[in-house]
């Protein structure tokens, strides 16, 4: 079986980290559990300039590497690979974030899983 897994907010807790960035950059304090929209610009009530700054900061290598793994994700994925399934990680992250995203996967014992930026 082929299994495709989204990176952000499936494999790792991306939105939770973005709440920290929004607070650091703009003093906007929206607790993670209160993020109501996939559109973070709307969730944090940001103007276009602020949203662009948030996205830029969130995709810096030093930030990407700090994202917490969704509990149990790597164990489940490795089990699927061990069972013979073809597993792929898919992300809408900008292509220039490929290397740190690949590093994050490798550091979380997902070296056998290909990564695709779409």
Whereabouts are the PLM-identified features?
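Short loop/turn segments at strand-loop or loop-helix junctions that form parts
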Residues: 56
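Active-site neighborhood of HAD-like aspartate-dependent phosphohydrolases
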Residues: 1-53
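Conserved aromatic-histidine-acidic binding/catalytic patches
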Residues: 6, 10, 65, 93
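A short, structured active-site edge motif that brings together acidic residues
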Residues: 88-94, 108-118
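Short, acidic loop-to-helix structural element flanking the phosphoryl-transfer center
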Residues: 59-89, 95-104
């Amino acid at each position: 079986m082929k299994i495709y897994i989204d990176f952000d907010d499936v494999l790792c807790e991306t939105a939770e980290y973005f709440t920290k960035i929004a607070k650091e950059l703009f003093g906007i304090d929206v607790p993670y559990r209160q993020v109501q929209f996939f559109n973070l610009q709307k969730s944090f009530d940001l103007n276009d300039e602020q949203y662009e700054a948030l996205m830029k900061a969130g995709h810096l290598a030093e930030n990407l590497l700090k994202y917490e793994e969704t509990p149990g994700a790597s164990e489940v994925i490795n089990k699927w690979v061990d069972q013979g399934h073809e597993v792929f990680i898919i992300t809408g992250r900008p292509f220039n974030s490929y290397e740190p995203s690949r590093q994050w996967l490798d550091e979380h014992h997902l070296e056998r899983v290909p990564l695709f930026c779409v």
